[in-house]
Amino acid sequence: MPEPLMEIFKMNGIIFDIKRFATHDGNGIRTTVFLKGCPMKCVWCQNPEGISAERKPLFFKNRCIKCRICEKFSKEKRAIFENNNFSEQRFSSKDIQNIIENCPACAVQMDSKLVSSNELLKEILRDEIFFTHEGGVTFSGGEPFIQKNFLIEMLKKLKERNIHTAVETALNIDTDILKEALPYLDTVYADLKIFDDEKHKKYTGVSNKLIKKNIEFLLKSSKKENVIIRTPMIPEFTADKENIKKISSFISELYSDVKYEILNYNPLAESKYEMAGKEYCFKENPPLYSGKEMKDFGKTAEENGIKKIIIES
């Protein structure tokens, strides 16, 4: 990460979304905060706007009224909608800001905002009444631990108020960071997407050796009962029984009562790639897996040592 960004993250955080009344990101009713930046480059990423640690512009094609105001700020003197995809390379940062300020339809917006821990806490506490009955706050991304100082500061502030905390992580982080944050976390949702290391490198851009090391640390820690290992079912990449078999065997050998969650494919990500001017990995967006298909994936996990299976269909 560039040094200037590291300095910013020491004082503030960059968030790209806050999802209120979330029911799939932990127990109870939750507020999920999405932190920007990820060291992995999963080709199917469900939140492509969260990969870069820097703030980027998005083009909302459905809002555009083709007024051509953006044209005068383009290096090529072409309106944004005249390209199949919006490319920020055609605009300087100053030009993008001018478009955001002048577009009458708000068709171009930055994908994230800079906030202090106190500002974010104030925003979160608007929902505090809903955190009773096991609700709380979940940090997602991107990779939340990329902004480790900001994340840990937020976790401490929430625990001071006895608010339940959770994190969704791909675990491609230094183990010492995990050790520092764990005392302030009630639940950890940790991804292991692909067991084979070469395939993992090919489709995520990184080795999974550190990820496996961190999973081993978590499943041997005092909080192992509050760790849920997850695998998203991505057609062509992760959704095969051999992958589930190997992951299930690996994690159940580390902790026999491990909780393993199998997540259904999310077809809603495709539109995000269009907004970000990026190409999606699927030419034709696959559908959700059926309930029967998801149960079959779960059966494979159970046959390979998993006692506590969670299926999100």
Residue map of PLM features:
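N-terminal pre-triad scaffold of radical SAM enzymes
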Residues: 15-69, 86-94
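Acidic/glycine-enriched edge-of-secondary-structure segments
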Residues: 5, 107-112, 200-204
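Auxiliary Fe-S-binding modules of radical SAM enzymes
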Residues: 2-27, 235-313
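Conserved dinucleotide-binding and phosphotransfer motif residues
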Residues: 106, 160-161, 304
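N-terminal-biased segments
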Residues: 26-27, 34, 52, 56-61, ...
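Iron-sulfur cluster-binding cysteine motifs and their immediate structural context
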Residues: 43-50, 69-85, 98-114
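Conserved AdoMet/S-adenosylmethionine-binding subsite of the radical SAM
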Residues: 118-275
